[in-house]
UniProtKB/Swiss-Prot annotation:
Belongs to the RutC family. InterPro entries: RidA, RidA_CS, RutC-like_sf, YjgF/YER057c/UK114. GO terms for molecular function: deaminase activity. This is RutC family protein in leuC 5'region. PANTHER family: 2-IMINOBUTANOATE/2-IMINOPROPANOATE DEAMINASE RIDA, 2-IMINOBUTANOATE_2-IMINOPROPANOATE DEAMINASE. It comes from Leuconostoc mesenteroides subsp. cremoris. One of its GO terms (cellular component) is cytosol. SUPFAM superfamilies: YjgF-like.
Amino acid sequence: MSKKVVSTTTAPKALGPYSQAILNDNTLYISGQIGIDPETDEFAGATTAEQAHQIFDNIDNILHEAEFSRNDIVKAALFFDDIADFALVNDIYAQYFDTTSVEEFPARSAVQVAALPKNAKLEIEITAMK
């Protein structure tokens, strides 16, 4: 078993005592990402849509740093501050994976939580495997 910290300046730095991602053998665990632009350390926008797009950019950048791709994602966990945004995020999520078959999407869970760090609208955690 080999465990390696994955870190990139093209995604926001951790807000607490955790790594952006951990690569353990062939599995990449990406910590929950919120819609912070790594260049400004501020939210990419106030809306769920703006934050969702930034989250997917951040995830892409971490995947790239670990030499993984979107096709390697096997599980996504979505945390909403308001589950009413579920359909909106589904549309953005579907564009991100760019697939026509629901069977090709990663496994996923989506829940509403009481609050997210920095009052984010959405947080997404990813597991990817090669």
